[in-house]
Design a protein with these regions (language model features):
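Glycine-rich oxoanion-binding loops at beta->alpha junctions
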Residues: 1, 51-107, 116, 144, ...
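N-terminal phosphate-binding or glycine-rich loops at protein starts, especially the Walker A/P-loop
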Residues: 2-53
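Short coil/turn connectors at secondary-structure junctions
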Residues: 2-7, 33-36, 71-74, 104-108, ...
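Short glycine-rich or small-residue beta-strand-to-loop segments that form or flank ligand, phosphate
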Residues: 6-16, 75-81, 107-113, 139, ...
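Short, ordered loop/turn segments at secondary-structure junctions
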Residues: 12-14, 41-47, 81-82, 114-115, ...
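Short glycine/serine/threonine-rich phosphate/pyrophosphate-binding segments
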Residues: 16-26, 48-49, 92-95, 115-123, ...
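Accessory alpha-helical/coil subdomains and C-terminal extensions
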Residues: 100, 108-113, 119-134, 154-221
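Acidic/polar active-site rim loop that often engages polyanionic ligands
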Residues: 140-153, 180
């Protein structure tokens, strides 16, 4: 497989510790497969609709820059929380986006994100197929919630799970120093899934018994 045309990549939703590693991976793979240019959306699909697009070849012009990107926190290209409408209801943003794809000779679009980002790339793919477009639309999973279907461990989940286990261990140890007993309740992110809450069990070890109770949305309490 080779990509003789240009590639476009964007980031969306909340940043994770490894979202820029995925961006670096897309860039390196696209160049290895012959992409003439790799463009980046600034501030996701919302920024793209405002014409905010950069040539990543100008920014990632040597190996050191790419290696630094892999270890850079937050979202290098910026992010957004923007959902595309149903094209049957409002086709205007789709027309605008496909005009931009044509202007920059885009042959493949990568969108790095979670549930809403996958919804965006799915809508673009369906719209393109309906219009006979040959552009390939590819979703790159990213979510600390670990709640994307058919994905065992989403990039970002492991880092968040480790962070939660570390924080809970510190909270438990701090709470144990007082003679007066207390009850501490920690509310963990995760949308509608309990993967992150379950990761709190990793706080248990030789120096800590871990949480007394872990409540998961999948199990009634």
């Amino acid at each position: 497989m080779s990509w003789g045309t240009n590639v476009l990549v964007g980031q969306s939703g909340g940043p994770t510790a490894v979202i820029n590693s995925s961006l670096a991976g897309v860039y390196e793979a696209a160049k290895a497969l012959g992409a003439a240019h790799v463009y980046g959306m600034e501030y996701g699909i919302q920024g793209l609709l405002q014409g905010k697009i950069v040539d990543l070849d100008d920014r990632l012009d040597d190996k050191m820059e790419i290696e630094l990107l892999k270890r850079t926190p937050s979202s290098y290209l910026g992010s957004c929380r923007f959902k595309l409408p149903n094209p049957a209801t409002d086709e205007r943003p789709f027309v605008q986006l496909f005009e931009l794809f044509a202007k920059y000779c885009i042959g493949a679009v990568f969108y790095i994100g979670g549930n809403d980002s996958m919804d965006t790339i799915a809508k673009l793919s369906a719209y393109g197929a309906a219009k006979g477009s040959e552009i390939r639309f590819i979703g790159v999973p990213k979510t600390i919630d670990n709640d994307l279907m058919y994905t065992d461990h989403t990039p970002g989940y492991g880092s968040a799970a480790k962070y939660i286990a570390t924080i809970l261990k510190e909270v438990i140890c701090d709470s144990s120093v007082y003679d007066i007993r207390s009850v501490t309740v920690a509310e963990i992110m995760g949308r509608h899934t309990g993967w992150l809450a379950g990761a709190a069990s990793l706080a248990a070890g030789a120096d800590c018994n871990g949480p007394d109770i872990i409540l998961l949305p999948e199990r009634p309490f």
